[in-house]
Amino acid sequence: MALSFVMASCVKTKTYRVNDANRDWFADSTNCNFAMLDDNGIQQSFRFAPADSYTTETGASILFVIPTDKGEHEHITQSGANSYGTIRVSTTISAYKLMGGEYSDIDELRLYFNEAVYVLGIERNLFYPDSDNKYKCYESSTENAMEYSAEYIDSYTVSEKNYEGVMHLKLIDVAYPLTKNFPTEIYYAKHYGLIQCTLDDKLTLRRLPSVSKE
């Protein structure tokens, strides 16, 4: 008992924080409320809460009286929806950094968009994609897995406004019937968040440059 206490006191806590550059993927407070226009000329207003952070712990166990290091990992999250409640988006970036070696500085991004869950290792998959540039996207209600491509675009123009630093995700393998309003293509900009999306592979919404006053 005493030995376990002594060994536990030797456990070291290492703190992992989300990389500074990745904090820019969340919408600034002035960009949380906005409007989007779809192909049918229907305008929808969106509201997002300011980004918030929390921490979780990993490790800290004692195996065969040998203490393991404890990790404290930062997570930053931001959520919002349109006024109709038909589009819900939540973005979380986590400082896991558990794999070591060449993966030791990678933050994980999880983009929840209605029933879709896109998972991405930002530093690796977005800037140094695999040779086939194919990653897994999940449908949360069915757990069906599909493939999507990811790319980083230096700049992209939507509704005559230019955005710098844009993440482009596109579904490339639809093997199952999709749930309604499933996002098949997403453009996500630094400091702004969602700027364009295509639902059900047929209806596209584009962000308007003016900020909603609602």
Task: Name each model-derived stretch.
Residues M1-A2:
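Sec-dependent signal peptide recognition
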Residues V6-S9:
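C-terminal motif of bacterial Sec signal peptides marking the signal peptidase cleavage site
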